[in-house]
UniProtKB/Swiss-Prot annotation:
<dbReference type="GO" id="GO:0046657">
    <property type="term" value="P:folic acid catabolic process"/>
</dbReference>
<dbReference type="GO" id="GO:0071713">
    <property type="term" value="F:para-aminobenzoyl-glutamate hydrolase activity"/>
</dbReference>
<dbReference type="Pfam" id="PF01546">
    <property type="entry name" value="Peptidase_M20"/>
</dbReference>
<dbReference type="InterPro" id="IPR002933">
    <property type="entry name" value="Peptidase_M20"/>
</dbReference>
<dbReference type="GO" id="GO:1902494">
    <property type="term" value="C:catalytic complex"/>
</dbReference>
<dbReference type="InterPro" id="IPR036264">
    <property type="entry name" value="Bact_exopeptidase_dim_dom"/>
</dbReference>
<dbReference type="Pfam" id="PF07687">
    <property type="entry name" value="M20_dimer"/>
</dbReference>
<dbReference type="GO" id="GO:0005737">
    <property type="term" value="C:cytoplasm"/>
</dbReference>
<keyword id="KW-0378">Hydrolase</keyword>
<dbReference type="InterPro" id="IPR011650">
    <property type="entry name" value="Peptidase_M20_dimer"/>
</dbReference>
<dbReference type="InterPro" id="IPR033845">
    <property type="entry name" value="AbgA"/>
</dbReference>
<dbReference type="GO" id="GO:0016805">
    <property type="term" value="F:dipeptidase activity"/>
</dbReference>
<comment type="similarity">
    <text>Belongs to the peptidase M20 family.</text>
</comment>
<protein>
    <recommendedName>
        <fullName>p-aminobenzoyl-glutamate hydrolase subunit A</fullName>
        <ecNumber>3.5.1.-</ecNumber>
    </recommendedName>
</protein>
<dbReference type="InterPro" id="IPR052030">
    <property type="entry name" value="Peptidase_M20/M20A_hydrolases"/>
</dbReference>
<comment type="subunit">
    <text>Forms a heterodimer with AbgB.</text>
</comment>
<dbReference type="GO" id="GO:0046982">
    <property type="term" value="F:protein heterodimerization activity"/>
</dbReference>
Length: 436
């Protein structure tokens, strides 16, 4: 029987093909319709049991959902770009989640692996110096680009599905492969958690590539993700003639501006790093009109859930105070959230032991010091740990052409096979009878 390494290496062309296809047809959060249908078909052909759409995505827990017009427009766009008719109805309306299950029929725990599928709202570089453009797989969808590696993550998930099915006789218990929508903006994981997809999981691993980790290094217990809350603040004032009757107006723009300054003046927390950022401010309707509406798009972050909550609470106070100062109303809407990461030490050690055996891995380390933004797979990790399971977040280093969320982002595709083999070893070599 061919070895695990030989089999994974034989998948390398497919891994590259999948990654480039997903890259070319990039789809951002909650509209990954084409991507989801291709993933579902591949998993179905392998014999996995599938739970799709509303079965694995809680409707009321979705955050940052596009409006109905956008959802329908992107649904039609996906159909025109080759979304598979036999699957697409399951995902209509922004329910683009998939859970594939392989039940071996042999006693053992439930082991889950999570990858994300969404692209960013970003226009890709259109220059021959950019490999995806030069080689013909740059995004064909305006304003949507895989600039964080999720195309690679989806390919890794499919490669892992093929590998575990090939070596199924060496497995025990149940394998769950989770394909998550809308990670960008930390919008999608909570809806899958609230649908119960990880409630039965004993061992959980989430996956990312890059993030500044050098090629050949695998970080097996990334604990540097910050807790975060994303929200919009809508200010509502009263319009008036700016020249004739300015005193009749209540200026929403000034309230939003005052709130912005106050937000960026929130004192840091003594127990760890904190962040606040107003990324967007939109206001007004005309030069000679007292602005009656304004919008702020805001995020808070903290090295711990406690610190993030501190910043968020102060932010709400600042926003309410600014609204009161200018006599306007304000409403905030939650758009995304994630907790800080806290990997399980025993599971991290097991992941390290398996990554160290993979060709192309120079070092398998526990953690890195540099902050890595935020990631909503931490919500899945936390739920698994609440149920006495173990969880971790693994980062596979790779050479990047440009940083994450940059229009020139690209990565060395050799990392795909390294990730597949590492994750497969994690399951295939697991001591099913005694656990860890």
């Amino acid at each position: 029987m061919e070895s695990l390494n030989q089999f994974v290496n034989s998948l390398a062309p497919k891994l590259s093909h999948w990654r480039r296809d997903f890259h070319h047809y990039a789809e951002s959060g909650w509209v990954e319709f084409r991507t989801a249908t291709l993933v579902a078909e591949e998993l179905h052909q392998l014999g996995y049991s599938l739970a799709l759409g509303r079965e694995v995505v809680n409707e009321s827990s979705r955050m940052g959902l596009p409006d109905e017009f956008t959802l329908q427009r992107e649904f039609e766009r996906a159909r025109q770009q080759g979304a598979l008719a036999q699957w697409i109805a399951a995902f209509e309306g922004g329910f683009t989640g998939i859970v594939a299950t392989l039940d071996t029929g042999r006693p053992g725990p439930v082991m889950a692996f999570r990858v994300d599928m969404d692209a960013l709202d970003l226009s890709e570089e259109q220059d021959v110096s950019h490999r995806p453009y030069r080689d013909g797989f740059a995004s064909c969808n305006a304003g949507m680009m895989h600039a964080c590696g999720h195309d690679g993550h989806t390919a890794i998930g499919l490669g892992l599905a093929h590998t575990l099915k090939q070596f199924e006789s060496g497995l025990h218990g149940v394998i769950k492969l989770i394909f998550q929508p809308a990670e960008e903006g930390t919008r999608g994981a909570r809806a899958m958690v609230d649908a119960g997809v990880v409630d039965d999981v004993d061992y959980f691993t989430a996956v990312h590539i890059g993030t500044g980790v050098p090629a050949g290094t695998v970080v097996c217990g990334s604990d540097n993700f910050m807790a975060t809350t994303k929200f919009d603040a809508h200010f509502t004032g009263t319009a008036a003639h700016a020249g004739a009757k300015p005193e009749d107006g209540h200026n929403a723009l000034l309230a939003a501006a005052q709130a912005t300054l106050a937000l960026h003046a929130i004192a840091p927390h003594s127990e760890g790093a904190s962040r606040v950022n107003v990324g967007v401010m939109q206001a007004g309707s005309g030069r000679n009109v007292v602005p009656a509406s304004a919008l702020l798009k805001v995020e808070t972050r903290g090295a711990s859930d406690v610190i993030n909550q501190y910043v968020f609470d102060r932010a709400q106070q600042a926003i309410q105070g600014a609204a009161t100062m200018y006599g306007v109303g304000v409403e905030t809407r939650l758009m995304g959230a994630a907790t800080a990461s806290s990997p399980s030490p025993q599971w991290v050690a097991w992941l390290q032991s398996q990554a160290a055996q993979v060709a192309g891995v120079n070092q398998a380390i526990e953690r890195v010091e540099a902050p890595a933004g935020s990631e909503d797979a931490t919500l899945m990790m936390a739920r698994v740990q609440q149920h006495q399971g173990q969880a971790s977040y693994v980062v596979f280093g790779t050479q990047l052409a440009a940083g994450h969320h940059n229009e020139k982002f690209d990565f060395d595709e050799q990392v795909l096979a390294i990730a597949v083999e590492t994750l497969a070893r994690t399951a295939l070599n697991f001591p099913w009878t005694r656990g860890i």
